[in-house]
Amino acid sequence: MTRSASASNGPGVVRSLTPFLDPLPIPPRRVIAEPTRLTVRLQTAMHQYHSGLPPSRVWTYDGHLPGPTIEVRRGVPVEVQWDNRLEGTLPVTVVRAPRFEVDGLPVQCAPGRSGGVPDADAAALPGFSVTHLHGGLTHATSDGWTENLALPGQSTLDTYPNDQRAAMLWYHDHVMGVTRFSVYAGLAGLWIVRDEREQELGLPEGPPYEVPLLLADRNFDVGSDGRLTGELLHKTDPEVMECFSPFTVVNGAIWPVVEVEPTTYRFRLRHGSNARTYRPVVPRDGEPDNQ
């Protein structure tokens, strides 16, 4: 494909989605005060990343993207039964596109396949799963080792002691060799551990003044009419395995907005992208404030 043939898939398509239009979603909370067993179901669902996009087929925890935020006090053990009810194959088109620029953008930062051919092996991936609590001090038997797979219709039971200092962790799928695809498909959520030392700081706890933010980037396929289809696209070039996608997603929404009051907020960020880096800033009078 020549550059001119692919120009319609460049910055103009990215700009077709209006930023700061949709409200910031807040994942549902599961607040745990005593030793508990939870059941979290892995499900295939439809999810709309932006009001200007058609819904996308995704993989989720409990039908939410991101999955429910689990909040627990330090030292309170939690058992989680991860119930795999995923249907169908991987809901992401995986391509490697020829190495060239699209209107000045690296090819993987432009929407659409850009001449890349879908990976047939990735397209056939079934919904195997194993969940890992990233950053958790967890026994090996519950750590979500990459080959301890549960097939659709099966479950795993893991124990999390939560005996560690306050932190915002995240849980995600961890299948050997394809973690990048299954997390891209939606299998991720937040896990908050609280302790007395954190409580002494007097920081906001819970909504609306504590705002968890799971950052990610996503790309989408483009139809013959030049419009985004909503189909998730994982595109790389032949020389770079890492994926850098053009749309920034926060809590499952592209470029969302949150209305705030003139008071203290606690914004908690978790980086959930494959490789992209971010430089979060707070604007003051229209300019970045790095103080």
Regions found by a protein language model. Give the residues of each.
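Histidine-centered copper-binding motifs that mark active-site loops
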Residues: 1-291
